[in-house]
């Protein structure tokens, strides 16, 4: 499983909140990539080469209830293949984040990220 996030976020708080989960995600076997080609807002997921989820909504109350964002589930092999190709291109334009990278962050940086992570539900 791969997670692609923008290397530069338009919000320092959102970036810190995201990074507060990196160690747990890496421990769970998730491959994290920081995309250098610009800001990514779309959320995409491909499953079993024939199912695709695409949209703008985060899976949180704010996106679903307040912002009225949507995702679309598509059962189509060709669509899923094209989306998978796009996802691969994002990974090619990214830098991988590994456990060594996360453990090299300073105590101050990790404290900041974890403190912001506590308020992530309201960001």
Kindly give the residue locations of the regions a language model identified.
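PLD/PLD-like phosphodiesterase catalytic module centered on the HKD motif
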Residues: 1-123
């Amino acid at each position: 499983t791969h997670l692609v996030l923008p290397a530069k976020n338009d919000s320092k708080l959102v970036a810190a909140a995201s990074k507060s989960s990196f160690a747990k995600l890496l421990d769970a076997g998730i491959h994290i990539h920081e995309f250098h080609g610009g800001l990514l807002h779309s959320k995409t997921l491909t499953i079993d080469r024939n199912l695709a989820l695409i949209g703008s909504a985060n899976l949180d109350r704010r996106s679903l209830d307040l912002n009225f964002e949507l995702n679309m589930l598509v059962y189509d092999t060709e669509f899923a293949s094209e989306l998978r190709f796009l996802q691969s291109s994002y990974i090619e334009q990214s830098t991988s984040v590994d456990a060594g990278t996360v453990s090299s962050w300073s105590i101050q940086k990790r404290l900041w990220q974890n403190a912001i992570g506590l308020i992530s539900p309201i960001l």
